[in-house]
Amino acid sequence: MKIASVDIGTNAVKSKIFETTPTSIKFIDGIRSPIRLGAEVFEEGKLSDKKLRELVSTLKRYQKKFTKDKIDQYEIIATSALRNTTNSEEARTYIENKIEHPIRIISGLEEAQLIGFHPKAQKENNKAYVDVGGGSTEIYIYNNPKHSIQSFQLGGVRIMLKKDKRKEWDRLDKWLKQFNDITEIIGLGGNIRAF
């Protein structure tokens, strides 16, 4: 079976395609389209009609590829930019109607929880997995038998545009102080790889 995921992020829309069997999953292909939703959301507060049309056009291109590649199932997830825009529900409804497919806008904590699905994340104690996105940063810490997760409104685009808040940095600092036994920090996501 072929499956795909679509991530509507702050910097880009990304898709990954996988071949699955009952016992394995194999990466086949990836697509990335730099739409930059976050710059508009963090500067103007909402997504414009023009930006929504650009997003719809991109998603329709992905859908054509999924049809051509015989993808059996795919899910579209949206993160910081779509959850932070003041017209979030209107935008989602508009997009869903145009592409005839549901979009799930996930919370920052849901994003952090997803890190825990990586096989290494639940085997290695005292390590912090940090996903620095364009609009937010999610942290997953595993310390057998429990884990801790948190999300902060501190992403690369938000910081670059000087839309980060001192209060959020203080919240991050306070949260991290409870973990004095962290031995390693592992960075995840495109913003980390870009450096």
Where do the protein language model's features map onto the residues?
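Short acidic, Gly/Ser-rich segments with clustered Asp/Glu that frequently serve as metal-coordination loops
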Residues: N11-A12, G135
